[in-house]
Amino acid sequence: MALTAEVLFVNTDYIKRITSLNGSVEDSVVVPAIILAQDKYIQQYLGTDLLNYLKTNVSSLTGVYETLMDTYIRKATCWWTMVELIPNLYVKLDNGGLVIRASENTNPISEDDLHREVERARANAQFYTERLVSYLTKNSSSFPQYTSNVSPDMHPEKVAYNQNGLTVSKGKNFFKYGGDRKPSVLDNSPYDC
């Protein structure tokens, strides 16, 4: 069975242009973080149907879909990629196990510095995600795929905000709608959001 190619909303050149990521970082290190960012964070706010629609049509988007992609999704994807990538630039998994990356002319940063850089990237990602969610909720009638998800698809989270370093979202309660996520203390009630 052949693996299908992943459709990426951003490429490594875009990430290196928008962030402080050094141009010498290999694409093979960055691409897995892009894929993870799209699956783990972006899908959470787009929902499965809109994500799949955008992936299918990424090279031919026009109108509101092009605006959504170019103005909102790409920057959010870029910074969520950095949240996932920064720890991988610090630690490397090789034949000998986990090692801290270092070259001859550099010194590795402390864990505190690492966490600070991840949190800076997360703050940027949350900023762009809040803009994305705001745009989608205000213009949901322009995006029929935003509201067409049915179980087992991911339903989009409709609110995103930051509280004490955590991104807190309120969307459909997946437990109520047939998902396998049990209600948590972050839910307004165990049965409805």
Model features per residue range: what roles?
Residues 1-74, 88-193:
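Conserved short "hinge" loops at termini or chain/domain junctions
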Residues 77:
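Catalytic-loop motifs flanking and including active-site residues across diverse enzymes
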